[in-house]
Amino acid sequence: LDYVNHIDPELSNNIGYTRLVNMNLLREINGKAQAVKFSNDAPDGQSNAMASMMAAQTGVGVSAFPKQLENGKNNFLKDNYSLLEGNYPEKETDVVLIVDSNNTTNINALKNLGFDVKDNQKIGFSDIVGTKMKLANNNAFYTKLPTGNFIPNQDLQAVYDNPENTELTISGILRIKDSSTMNLLAPGIAYSDALSTN
């Protein structure tokens, strides 16, 4: 990885990695802190093979977009995705919603973020852009038991209110450009690779 981490930006200005991460995400919904997640899986865990296949029809299926090595050069998102609402990410704490050519996305991505949506229900882009959630650090999210084991803290409001959390914002809604050959991001939430490494 040292070679990739130190690659000349003239050779490749956007580097992406595949990682499996579990972020401790919370969102305040109707005045109450609730656990949420970046996932296209059915919230009840009852995903079937057909639903999984449909979810992956567009995009390769990754949820992290590549890190840009040098500003002012090729930008993976700007080069390959049109901005439909909001802004392209400016910070690693900005996440985006990816939609397909019909401006639809994976409904489970929205349900898993606490949006109350039904199949085929239309929701305005402006109702999504600007949504904020907290990324809780492990020290706030987990409680140590007398046995030495750790379990998730049951007081989600205290976890949500912890000043050491990082606030994330859905900054924009993007759609793959017709001219793009780099349709890597599946419909749903996409975030900077840098977010998953901090």
What are the language-model segments listed below?
Residues L1-N198:
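Basic-flanked hydrophobic alpha-helices used for secretion and membrane insertion
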